[in-house]
Regions:
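C-terminal accessory regions of radical SAM enzymes
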Residues: 187-199
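Conserved AdoMet/S-adenosylmethionine-binding subsite of the radical SAM
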Residues: 2-190
Length: 199
């Protein structure tokens, strides 16, 4: 936390208000972590006396105390809603959506919240006037990606879409140029731009 505080002071001094992204390489609401609902020793940095504050909440409180914007990306679903009170007008809540059904999600994303739970968290964030975004990376089943956009565009501000990599056999089965044309047409029909508007 001291390092984060130091970095925030440096960013403030440089007038660098680019949002902090939490996270593409991990998950701030990883459902398998034991400390997501446990007392955090980091509370002293944010002046919290609430022993239920998680590591993630403490970091968000610190960011908020410096009025520094943040972007959340999670597969944790409604677990993240407990921190929605910390969001300001320059912050955004995002989830990764890869599949539209539980069976595929359980196979490819073990330990993650199921798609309906993640979608519920987006709806709740939108209801609270929090900007929302979805990362659709990697696209494994283009039909499901298209269906997810159709299911969520009313309460999602921005979609980031990325192609599948490192699975040559699966990649070869997908007509990527065709998918790109179709997904761009769908986003345009829904009044959305791919990968813009979140920072």
């Amino acid at each position: 936390m001291a390092n984060i505080q130091h970095d925030l002071l440096m960013l403030r001094g440089a007038r660098d208000m680019r949002p902090v992204l939490m996270s593409v390489v991990g998950d701030p609401y990883d459902m398998g972590r034991k400390d997501n609902d446990k007392p955090s020793g980091l509370m002293k940095y944010v002046g919290s006396n609430d022993h239920s504050d998680s590591h993630t909440r403490c970091v968000l409180m610190l960011l908020r105390s410096y009025d520094h914007p943040f972007l959340i990306l999670t597969k944790g679903g409604m677990l993240a809603a407990k921190d929605f009170d910390l969001y300001g007008p320059n912050d955004a809540f995002g989830v990764t959506l890869t599949f539209d059904n539980d069976a595929d999600s359980l196979h490819w994303e073990p330990g993650a919240a199921l798609p309906a739970d993640r979608i519920a968290s987006l709806k709740e964030a939108h209801r609270r006037n929090i900007r929302t975004w979805v990362s659709m990376e990697p696209v494994i089943c283009p039909e499901q990606t298209m269906h997810l956009i159709e299911m969520t565009y009313d309460f999602v501000d921005c979609f980031w879409i990325g192609k599948l990599n490192h699975f040559p056999e699966l990649e070869a089965k997908i007509d990527w140029p065709k998918f790109r044309r179709e997904v761009e047409a769908l986003l345009q029909k829904c009044g959305k731009q791919p990968g813009t508007g979140m920072g």
